[in-house]
C-alpha cells in the first residue's frame, strides 16, 4: 500500500477546507457576481482604461462576422466564459428564451434591461417578419453599446433601443411607441424592479391573455417577491426552468415563465 506523501496530504486537507466555501458559493451565487462586478472588474477597468462592456463590444467587432447574429452571440459567449464574466442571459439559459420566441412568434416583444445587447440580438434574430422588439435600458453607455451591437449584427431595423427607467417608459408604451398589448416580455434588469414593473404592465393594460413573461436570474441574485406574485396571484400560469448562472457550471439559477391568464383569473392548483 502506498504511503500518502506530504503533498498529497496537503492537497487533501486543502480540499476538505475548501468544501464549506464551495457549498457556500453554490448556495449563495451572488458572491460570484459580487467578486466579478465589485472586485475583478474595477481592477481590470483601471488597468485597461475602459469598461468591460466596451471590451466585449470591441471583441465582437474584431472577431465576429458582421451581419451574422449567431456569430455575434457565439463571440460574446466565448469572451464571457473564457475572459470576463458578464451578466448576459448566456448560451444555456438563452435556449429557454429562444424556445419562447419560437413558440410565441411575437409581433411585439418588450425587453427590460438591454445591457450589451446580447439578449436583444438573441431574440431579434428569431422574430417573424414585421415583428419588433423594444428594449429598455437605463444606462446610456449600455444603451449605446446595445445599439452598436445590433447594427453590427444587422438587426437594427427590428429593434428599438429606448433609453430610460422602466417605470418611466412603460406608461408611455401605448401612446409614444404605438403598443396595444405585448406578446412576450423578457425581464432581465434590476431584480427589485421585476415585481413593480410586472404590476405596472398590468395596470397599464399592456398584458393580454396569453402574454408570456420570461424572467431571468430568479434564483441568483433572486426575485422572491416577483415569484410569490406570479405563482400566488392566480393571474399567471408558471413554469420554472432550472439551470445555472450564466457562464457558470456550479451556481444554480433559474428562469421563470409566467403566462398571463387575465385579471381576476381563478387561482391555479
From Swiss-Prot:
Cofactor binding mode and count: Binds 1 Mg(2+) ion per subunit.
Origin superkingdom: Eukaryota
InterPro entries: Catechol_O-MeTrfase_euk, SAM-dependent_MTases_sf, SAM_O-MeTrfase
Required cofactor names: Mg(2+)
Pfam entry (one): Methyltransf_3
One Gene Ontology MF term: magnesium ion binding
Transmembrane segments: 5-25
Residue(s) carrying Phosphoserine: 265
Residues reported in the UniProt entry to bind substrate: 191, 217, 246
Cytoplasmic-side positions: 1-4
Biological process according to GO: catecholamine catabolic process; developmental process; dopamine metabolic process; lipid metabolic process; methylation
Enzyme Commission no: 2.1.1.6
Main enzyme class: transferase
Record's function text: Catalyzes the O-methylation, and thereby the inactivation, of catecholamine neurotransmitters and catechol hormones. Also shortens the biological half-lives of certain neuroactive drugs, like L-DOPA, alpha-methyl DOPA and isoproterenol.
Family classification: Belongs to the class I-like SAM-binding methyltransferase superfamily. Cation-dependent O-methyltransferase family.
Protein name stated in the entry: Catechol O-methyltransferase
